[in-house]
């Protein structure tokens, strides 16, 4: 009997996070909706821990989980390698430290089925959109609307996905590997070639932190590199200068926690990204933006309240009274 093409491929690039991967896969196989319509791709970037043991264990136990190991570490090119292994109708990336929620897999499959005839580009943005919070489904007609809606979250690995045939025509997939943001260019190519997309913003996973966050230069990647990737699309007239200006403000707003911890209250216990030339990078992009000056002047005040007083004083006090979850839900509904 001929093998049926999977409906959905979930592609997990991983490196030296064996226990995180084990936790992730154990969760996936327990979910309602985990069946032959779902293919799991594990792309091991030549890990030196026991990632191979974990991957092979689950792939032997479940035929629809496929484990691949790179002969050498190929850095961020592993993201495209993971997608290249996928055979599903719709293929998407998932971080190795992202646990799909109990109803999440059913949700993903239902959305794919809804769109499988028209093949409109779709992205699962996991309740990350802060520019249009009240809309759980956002239809974007071009790159400008896509950037306006998603902004900094375009860089999120788990937000990227594509119909298999659309992925097949993405050019130069590893062009921006050194920038650590290949996925941004992939999304820009797809949205511009197919005249828009649909963003599904319902939360479908929750992340967990397997260790200290560290690695690249935070603002060099998320500011310098992001806008370097955007530039060719600006030059072609696919992204308006007005969109760039608005997006830069959205980026700055999104990175308020990082600004506070880099310049005012270092949290080196769990956040150890390279911060070399952070102010220089921000200055080069924002010296003409009044919001930048307001943000830097007021950061000690809103930062102390949001990231010190609330978690260390307000939250414990409300927990004692049994009111924290109620308060959090009320605030979330009003947003």
Predicted segments, located by residue:
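Short beta-strand/loop segment that forms part of the nucleotide-sugar
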Residues: 36-46, 68-70
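Short aromatic/hydrophobic "clamp" motif used to bind/position activated sugar donors
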Residues: 91
């Amino acid at each position: 009997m001929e093998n049926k093409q999977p409906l959905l491929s979930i592609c997990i690039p991983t490196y030296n996070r064996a226990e995180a991967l084990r936790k992730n896969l154990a969760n996936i196989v327990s979910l309602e909706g985990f069946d032959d319509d779902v293919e799991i791709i594990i792309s091991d970037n030549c890990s030196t821990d026991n990632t191979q043991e974990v991957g092979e264990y689950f792939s032997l136990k479940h035929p629809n989980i496929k484990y691949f190991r790179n002969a050498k570490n190929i850095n961020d090119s592993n993201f495209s390698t993971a997608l290249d292994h996928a055979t599903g109708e719709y293929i998407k990336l998932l971080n190795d430290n992202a646990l799909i929620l109990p109803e999440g897999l059913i949700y993903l499959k239902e959305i794919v089925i809804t769109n499988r005839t028209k093949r409109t580009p779709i992205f699962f943005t996991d309740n990350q959109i802060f520019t249009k919070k009240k809309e759980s489904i956002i239809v974007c007609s071009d790159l400008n609307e896509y950037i306006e809606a998603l902004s900094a979250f375009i860089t999120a690995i788990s937000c990227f996905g594509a119909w298999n045939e659309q992925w097949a025509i993405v050019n130069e997939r590893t062009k921006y590997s050194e920038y650590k943001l290949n996925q941004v260019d992939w999304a820009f190519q797809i949205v511009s070639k197919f005249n828009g997309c649909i963003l599904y913003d319902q939360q479908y996973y929750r992340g967990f932190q397997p260790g200290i966050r560290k690695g690249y230069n935070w603002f060099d990647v998320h500011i310098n590199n992001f806008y370097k990737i955007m530039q060719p699309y600006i030059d072609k007239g696919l992204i308006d200068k007005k969109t760039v200006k608005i997006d830069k403000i959205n980026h700055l707003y999104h990175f308020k926690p990082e600004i506070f911890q880099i310049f005012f209250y270092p949290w080196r216990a769990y956040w150890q990204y390279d911060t070399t030339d952070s102010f220089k990078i921000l200055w080069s992009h924002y010296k003409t933006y009044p919001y930048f000056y307001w943000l830097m002047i007021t950061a000690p005040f809103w930062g102390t309240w949001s990231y010190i007083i609330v978690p260390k004083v307000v939250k414990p006090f409300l927990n004692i009274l049994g009111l924290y979850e109620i308060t959090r839900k009320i605030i979330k509904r009003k947003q």
